[in-house]
Regions:
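Structural signature of nuclease core domains in nucleic-acid processing machines
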Residues: 1-225
């Protein structure tokens, strides 16, 4: 039947009306959007200096440092590094290998800096702040066409630390990448920080006044927004 054959051919060749929307994922993570923007993950050519001790290798040491900054009672006036590491191991927050991999000099430098002083004296501190918000696909840089640019998409993630200062929020993102300057971190992760800003402002209904990257490798910081 030629008529039937014609209709089948037309159906096969006809583009699905909502094909552009089908290409949009149901959810994204803030970190994956950052990697998509650069086209690859940030490459660590050599191990950061603070990762040169202990038996843990590679990204696991970076994870250990993030876990330490998440759970350690670093804002206590009676903070003691040795005692705190023992407590974290005893309570299961860190393994002994992770505790051994923490560079005490890097922690000391961070805690003696201006950023830490601001965090400690702030009105409120939120560590490892988890969020789940809706954003337009254009912010996630995955919009297929102009028609889908404003289509909402679910985004989730976690902010290393945020604190409230003078009624506004400040976001702090710790990075362990081996780099020559904090400017290179800003280039690679600026989009991620802007997504964090959007998420925190939605979740807490508060203005974010600053987004800061702190390099544990260099002991330096750079403001993104």
């Amino acid at each position: 039947d030629k008529e039937l054959e014609k209709k089948l051919t037309e159906n096969i060749e006809t583009k699905y009306k909502y094909q552009d929307f089908v290409a949009i994922p149901t959810k994204v993570s803030a970190s994956s959007v950052s990697h998509k923007r650069t086209g690859k993950s940030f490459i660590v050519k050599t191990k950061p200096k603070f990762m040169n001790t202990g038996k843990i290798k590679g990204a696991s040491r970076g994870t250990a440092f993030h876990e330490f900054l998440h759970y350690a009672d670093i804002f206590s006036d009676s903070f003691n590094m040795t005692a705190e590491l023992k407590r974290l191991v005893s309570n299961g927050f860190l393994s002994q290998e992770q505790a051994d991999a923490i560079d005490r000099n890097a922690v000391k430098k961070f805690m003696s800096g201006e950023l830490f002083a601001r965090m400690k004296s702030s009105e409120r501190i939120m560590r490892e702040y988890r969020f789940a918000v809706m954003i337009p696909t254009k912010l996630a840089e995955i919009a297929v066409t102009d028609e889908t640019a404003d289509t909402p998409i679910f985004m989730q993630g976690a902010i290393d630390c945020a604190f409230i200062e003078n009624g506004k929020a400040v976001i702090v993102d710790y990075k362990t990448d081996r780099i020559d300057s904090v400017e290179s971190l800003a280039e690679s992760y600026s989009k991620q920080l802007l997504l964090y800003k959007n998420a925190l402002e939605q979740s807490e209904e508060i203005e974010v006044s600053e987004c800061i990257i702190y390099s544990l490798e260099l002991g330096e910081q750079i403001r993104i927004c």
